[in-house]
Amino acid sequence: MPQNEYIELHRKRYGYRLDYHEKKRKKEGREAHERSKKAKKMIGLKAKLYHKQRHAEKIQMKKTIKMHEKRNTKQKDDEKTPQGAVPAYLLDREGQSRAKVLSNMIKQKRKEKAGKWEVPLPKVRAQGETEVLKVIRTGKRKKKAWKRMVTKVCFVGDGFTRKPPKYERFIRPMGLRFKKAHVTHPELKATFCLPILGVKKNPSSPLYTTLGVITKGTVIEVNVSELGLVTQGGKVIWGKYAQVTNNPENDGCINAVLLV
């Protein structure tokens, strides 16, 4: 046995101290507090490097937790479905000609490119920057004013990772992040609570679109897979656009009309 491993040798012969495991548990419990105290006291380049390292660790930890959660959730097994099986709502579409389907698809794509959507609200009031973005003063003497906090409802995707708070320019509060919208189908005259996939266009500013700000008149993309809508080719439609018709920041919910 190497000369420097005398502690391991002693433990093999006589076992651990009686209070060893208790002491270890308490030390691990204190570690988080000690690390945070260290982070608060550090200044300069050392602090920057330390915060960067801690930020990377936190991201890794969150990703690991998410993976564990995914592992525990039950997922539908697609392999059990027979290969030739067709859902009931597609049975009458078997004899449709391929050429007709293709021409309709091309027409639809051209229509989408041209952006010929008849929206329920063609004109909406523009939202000013002072109204949407509140100035946050930072620094020891509160002299810096480059940070902005979004004061309207916004959508943030699942894969979004925050920058370290020190370098984050636009802050989107958790209380204003929405994931679902109440979407009304104009032909069916029914309302569904559907998950939001993204913000297509905010009429006020391209900046609001990139930030995912949802105000009255914003066009959002929603997941309509549970509605059972299908294309002429028999494929299930996954996402569709809808326009927001209310002021979500006042009502506490997003009401939208599906664009069909």
UniProtKB/Swiss-Prot annotation:
It comes from the Eukaryota. GO terms for biological process: rRNA processing. Its main location: nucleus. Keywords: Isopeptide bond, Nucleus, Phosphoprotein, Ribonucleoprotein, Ribosome biogenesis, rRNA processing, Ubl conjugation. Coiled coil: none annotated. Residues 20-34 have a biased composition (Basic and acidic residues). A motif (Nuclear localization signal) lies at residues 11-18. InterPro entries: NSA2_fam (IPR039411), Ribosomal_Se8/biogenesis_NSA2 (IPR022309). It is found in: Nucleus, Nucleolus. GO terms for cellular component: nucleolus; ribonucleoprotein complex. Residues 20-42 are annotated as: Disordered. PANTHER family: RIBOSOME BIOGENESIS PROTEIN NSA2 HOMOLOG. Involved in the biogenesis of the 60S ribosomal subunit. May play a part in the quality control of pre-60S particles. This is Ribosome biogenesis protein NSA2 homolog. The gene is Nsa2.
